């Protein structure tokens, strides 16, 4: 690993994305619907500055971009497992309700893990914030728009919590392996 250290991203600004010639941008398939505008959950005053810092960081990393869309989904923040850091969570319920579900079935992780039982050494593929490696098509990004203190923003990458994200990302990892 030390020989290839420069190939790893240790900061948000240095991480890349999957090559679009191997992983084309995702189109979100939807049934006919009416656009949605949901009122946002207020940011707690004590977390406001930290939430703004995280949003700016995601803009700089290319995960969020400005939007003029007529959609607005909710978002909120939760504590990560470390009990200190915050994670922004996008409530994609309205999008999931109109999405045509992917036919893929996620793998049985227990079966996969059992194959490594008793092994002296295992391998690990760590895709630093993996969903952020796969881009959404321009035509689908507006469906992910949400309101922030910096105006309307939309996701540029595969949304965590979207109905089809797990099977799509599973296919991506399978292709890589």
Tell where the protein language model's regions lie, with residue ranges:
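Catalytic palm active-site di-aspartate
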Residues: 27, 91, 126-128, 161, ...
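Hydrophobic (often cysteine-bearing) scaffold residues that line and stabilize catalytic clefts
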Residues: 47-51, 105, 124, 165-169, ...
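Cytochrome P450 core scaffold surrounding the K-helix E-X-X-R motif
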Residues: 96-104, 131-143
């Amino acid at each position: 690993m030390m020989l290839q250290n420069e190939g790893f991203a240790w900061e948000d600004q240095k991480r890349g994305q999957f090559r679009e010639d191997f992983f084309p941008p995702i189109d979100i398939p939807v049934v006919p619907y009416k656009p949605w505008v949901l009122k946002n959950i207020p940011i707690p005053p004590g977390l406001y500055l930290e939430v703004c810092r995280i949003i700016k960081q995601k803009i700089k990393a290319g995960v969020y971009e400005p939007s003029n869309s007529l959609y607005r989904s909710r978002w909120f923040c939760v504590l990560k497992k470390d009990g200190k850091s915050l994670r922004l969570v996008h409530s994609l319920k309205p999008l999931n309700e109109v999405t045509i579900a992917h036919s893929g079935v996620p793998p049985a992780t227990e079966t996969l893990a059992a194959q490594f039982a008793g092994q002296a050494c295992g391998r690990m593929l760590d895709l630093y914030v993996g969903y952020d490696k796969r881009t959404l098509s321009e035509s689908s990004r507006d469906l992910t728009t949400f309101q922030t203190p910096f105006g309307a923003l939309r996701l540029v990458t595969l949304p965590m919590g979207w109905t089809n994200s797990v099977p799509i990302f599973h296919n991506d990892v399978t292709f890589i392996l």
